[in-house]
Design a protein with these regions (language model features):
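N-terminal signal-anchor module of multipass membrane proteins
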Residues: 2-68
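Transmembrane-helix bundle segments that line or gate the permeation/cavity pathway
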Residues: 52, 59-174, 191
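Central hydrophobic cores of alpha-helical transmembrane segments
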Residues: 333-343
Length: 346
């Protein structure tokens, strides 16, 4: 990475007008109405299960991308990196999306509280008898009450971290107090440990427990790698669009875009490495409680085509597309590459 001093920000202050600020609660209201209508008509048409999985897919995309941006902020302070100062604010804003995402999690957690099992089969009565003795060991963890308590803790921690960095960063813009940077750097050490722990258990709860019999200790790393990749793409895309609109034209340089592209390239390979390593370990062990998960997704259902497509479109194409130094320094190319990565991550 280019360990250069951060540029002096001279762009005019950008703020939302009063009219635009008023659109925020209106947007939340429209979203709530839309989710409610989808729930009602999906229930009436017998398609609630399909709606639930579609909503979970989109929610997981937004959550993992926001968490990837929060990781970017924490690691920037932890390593005392100077190259990313001008793009760090973009990541801080995306990390703040974790607060409204707590509200958007309600369509997932409320059905769990009500005892519905369209998403999570462990939430239905008698699931222990159907699963056999292996489920007995998961009984205390996969319970309705603990599921809700854990998610309250996750969002409380993430919101605190995001608000802490965003609040201190914006306050430093006003006061110029260098001590705020030192505080963020010191707190980033223990925050990284807590953040990593929440990622592990949140990935278990949100996605791995969709199939409660299956287990993999590498799945949280897989979830994390995809989230960071999506977060880097979102940061890069937003920075490029801001510059195209005439803002921060000189503050974000080609070298910084090159660094972001290198990180995207690295996490593309890291995501593929973790995905293959998880598959290899399960294939080698050949334990039925693990192998059925891959058997269904590659050979016993229509999802096999989607799984093979991930290998091509999520790994090979972005890996080869971001390999050359010249393309990583081309803003137009990075614009389309960021959009592509976000789409394939979703």
């Amino acid at each position: 990475m280019h360990n250069t001093r951060p540029a002096q920000i001279t762009s005019p202050l950008i703020s939302l007008s009063t009219g635009r600020v008023k659109l925020v609660p209106l947007g939340l209201l429209v979203a709530a109405i839309g989710i409610g209508m989808a729930f009602f008509f999906g229930e009436a048409a017998g398609g609630y299960r399909r709606f639930s999985f579609a909503y979970l897919t989109s929610f997981s995309f937004l959550l993992s991308t926001s968490l990837g941006c929060l990781f970017f902020v924490i690691i920037q302070h932890l390593t005392k990196a100077a190259w990313g100062v001008t793009v760090r604010r973009i990541a801080e804003i995306f990390a703040m999306c974790l607060i409204p995402l707590a509200l958007l999690f309600l369509p997932i957690v409320v059905p769990v509280i009500l005892g519905r099992a369209e998403l999570y089969p462990w939430n239905q009565a008698g699931w222990l008898e159907e699963g056999g003795p292996l489920f007995q060991m998961k009984l205390d963890y996969l319970s309705r009450n603990w599921f809700v308590i854990r998610w309250i803790a996750y969002f409380a921690i993430w919101a605190f971290f995001a608000w802490n960095f965003f609040g201190k960063s914006t306050k430093q813009d006003q006061t110029g107090d260098v001590g705020l940077t030192l505080k963020m750097q010191r707190s980033s050490t223990w925050m990284m440990i807590v953040f990593a722990s929440t990622i592990v258990f949140a990935s278990f709860d949100l996605e791995m427990s969709l199939s409660p019999l299956w287990f993999s200790t590498m799945f949280p790393v897989y979830f994390f790698a995809g989230g960071v990749l999506g977060g880097l793409a979102a940061i890069t895309l937003t920075a490029l669009l801001l510059q195209r609109s005439g803002r921060v034209t000189d503050e974000i340089t080609v070298d910084q875009y090159h660094d972001l592209a290198k990180l995207m390239f690295g996490f593309t390979f890291f995501w593929g490495y973790i995905a293959f390593s998880q598959f290899l370990l399960i294939w080698y062990a050949n334990i039925p409680e693990e192998t059925f998960w891959y058997k269904f997704r590659f050979w016993d259902s229509a999802w096999g085509k989607a799984s093979w497509a991930l290998l091509i479109f999520h790994l090979l194409i972005p890996f080869l597309g971001l390999m050359a130094r010249t393309v990583r320094r081309n803003k137009t190319y990075l614009l389309f590459a960021s959009i592509y990565v976000l789409c394939i991550h979703w």
